Amino acid sequence: ADDYDDEVLPDARGHRPIDRKREELPSLRPAPPPISGGGYR
């Protein structure tokens, strides 16, 4: 059940196969702020 788990629905489970490439530089641009407050500006 672990063989096809990663190749059947990688993005469906939220493994972010394409995101892992862009997440290489998460510190480069703080565009997506983890704070939902929006008042820390």
Swiss-Prot record:
**Compartment list:** Secreted
Composition skew (Basic and acidic residues), residue ranges? 10-26
Name any Gene Ontology BP term.
Answer: adaptive immune response
Q: Does the keyword Coiled coil apply?
A: yes
Tell me, in a sentence or two, what this protein's role is: Cleaved by the protease thrombin to yield monomers which, together with fibrinogen alpha (FGA) and fibrinogen gamma (FGG), polymerize to form an insoluble fibrin matrix. Fibrin has a major function in hemostasis as one of the primary components of blood clots. In addition, functions during the early stages of wound repair to stabilize the lesion and guide cell migration during re-epithelialization. Was originally thought to be essential for platelet aggregation, based on in vitro studies using anticoagulated blood.
Q: Which residues carry this modification: Sulfotyrosine?
A: Y4
Q: Share what the entry says about its subunit structure, partners included.
A: Heterohexamer; disulfide linked. Contains 2 sets of 3 non-identical chains (alpha, beta and gamma). The 2 heterotrimers are in head to head conformation with the N-termini in a small central domain.
Keyword match Coiled coil: yes
Which portions of the sequence form the region Disordered? Answer: 1-41
User: What does the UniProt keyword field contain?
Assistant: Adaptive immunity, Blood coagulation, Coiled coil, Disulfide bond, Hemostasis, Immunity, Innate immunity, Secreted, Sulfation
User: What's said on domains?
Assistant: A long coiled coil structure formed by 3 polypeptide chains connects the central nodule to the C-terminal domains (distal nodules). The long C-terminal ends of the alpha chains fold back, contributing a fourth strand to the coiled coil structure.
Q: Which GO terms describe its cellular component?
A: cell surface; external side of plasma membrane; extracellular region; platelet alpha granule
* Renumbered residue ranges of the record's region Beta-chain polymerization, binding distal domain of another fibrin: 14-16
In alphabetical order, the GO MF annotations are:
protein-folding chaperone binding
Q: What is its main location?
A: secreted
Which residues are annotated as site, described as Cleavage? Answer: R13, G14
| Modification(s) after translation | Conversion of fibrinogen to fibrin is triggered by thrombin, which cleaves fibrinopeptides A and B from alpha and beta chains, and thus exposes the N-terminal polymerization sites responsible for the formation of the soft clot.
**Protein's UniProt name:** Fibrinogen beta chain
